[in-house]
A protein has these predicted regions:
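Alpha-helix initiation/capping motif
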Residues: 2-6, 26, 78, 125-128, ...
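Short amphipathic alpha-helical segments, especially helix-boundary/capping motifs
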Residues: 6-8, 21-24, 38-41, 62-67, ...
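A short, mixed-charge helix-start or loop-turn motif at secondary-structure junctions
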Residues: 30, 71, 121-125, 176-183
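C-terminal all-alpha effector/ligand-binding and dimerization domain
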Residues: 169-249
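Short linear motifs at protein or domain termini
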Residues: 1-95, 151, 226-237, 241-249
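Conserved amphipathic alpha-helical segments that form helical-bundle/coiled-coil interaction surfaces
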Residues: 73, 78, 88-90, 99-173, ...
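Low-complexity, flexible helical/coil segments
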Residues: 94-96, 104, 115-118, 126-128, ...
Length: 249
C-alpha cells in the first residue's frame, strides 16, 4: 500500500506542477499535500524525493520542499543538454523512422500549421498558444520515439518536463505582455523550424536533421534567456520599489 500511495502522491503533485498550478518556488507542504491527496505524510515525503530526483523539486534542510526554480545558468545548461541529445535523436530518427513514425511526427505539425494560420487572422488567445505548446512537445517526443533509442528517449522526456516547469513563468509573461505581432512572428519561426526538421527526417537526411534541430534549440535558448533576463530585471526593480516604500513609511 505504501508504494501505491507513493505513486498516487507522485502523480498528483507532478501533474499539478506540470499544469502550472504549483509554479517555480511554490512551497510543497507535506501535511497539506497529504490531506489534499488523502494519504499519510510518509508517501508524500517519498513522492517529493522522487520528484527531486526528476529535477522538478528541490528539498533543503529546515526549509522543506519547493518546486524547482531555475536561474539563467541552470536553464542554459538544461537547454545545452537538450540540444546535444535531441540533435543526435533527430539524426537517428532520419535513419530509423518508419512510415508510421513519419505520420506520428507530422500529426502535431499539421495542427500547428492550422493554429498558426488562424492566429494570423484573429486575436491571439492564450488557449491557442497553449495548444501550440502542447503540439510542440508532441512533435519533439514523436521524433524521440522514432530514434529507436529508449535510453535517450527517457532522458529527453525528463528534460522536456524540466523545461516545461522552467518555462512556466516565461511563457505566461510572454502571453500576457508580448505584442501580438511578436507572438505571431514567434509562432511562424517555430513552425518554419519544425518544417525543416520534419523535411530532413522524411528525406532520411540525418546530417540535415541534426543541423535543423540544433538551430531550433539554439534559437529557443537565445529567446528564452533574453526573456529570463528581462524578468530578473523586472523583479529587481519591483524589489527596489518595495524597499523604497518601506523606507518611506
Amino acid at each position: 500500500m505504501k508504494s501505491v500511495n507513493t505513486d498516487i502522491a507522485y502523480d498528483h503533485v507532478r501533474q499539478r506542477i506540470l499544469r502550472g498550478d504549483y509554479g517555480p518556488g511554490h512551497a510543497l507542504m507535506t501535511e497539506a499535500l497529504a490531506e489534499e491527496i488523502g494519504v499519510s505524510r510518509t508517501p508524500v515525503r517519498d513522492a517529493l524525493r522522487k520528484l527531486e530526483a526528476d529535477g522538478l523539486v528541490e528539498i533543503q534542510p529546515r526549509l522543506g520542499a519547493r518546486v524547482k526554480q531555475f536561474d539563467r545558468q541552470e536553464f542554459r545548461e538544461m537547454c545545452e543538454l537538450r540540444l546535444a541529445l535531441e540533435a543526435q535523436a533527430a539524426g537517428l530518427a532520419a535513419k530509423n523512422r518508419t512510415v508510421e513514425d513519419l505520420e506520428e511526427i507530422e500529426a502535431p505539425l499539421i495542427v500547428m500549421r492550422t493554429i498558426t494560420a488562424e492566429l494570423e487572422n484573429s486575436r491571439v488567445r492564450a488557449a491557442k498558444l497553449n495548444k501550440i505548446a502542447k503540439e510542440d512537445v508532441r512533435f519533439h517526443l514523436a521524433i524521440m520515439a522514432s530514434s529507436k533509442n529508449a535510453l535517450m528517449q527517457r532522458e529527453i522526456l525528463r528534460l522536456h518536463l524540466i523545461h516545461r516547469v522552467a518555462q512556466t513563468p516565461v511563457g505566461k509573461s510572454f502571453q500576457e505582455s508580448a505584442p501580438r505581432e511578436e507572438q505571431i512572428a514567434n509562432n511562424d519561426r517555430v513552425l518554419t523550424e519544425h518544417e525543416a526538421i520534419f523535411a530532413a527526417i522524411a528525406a532520411g537526411d540525418g546530417r540535415a536533421a541534426k543541423r535543423a534541430m540544433e538551430s531550433h534549440i539554439e534559437n529557443l535558448l537565445e529567446i528564452s534567456l533574453r526573456k529570463l533576463a528581462l524578468q530578473e530585471r523586472e523583479r529587481v526593480a519591483e524589489s527596489l520599489v518595495a524597499d523604497e516604500l518601506i523606507y518611506s513609511a
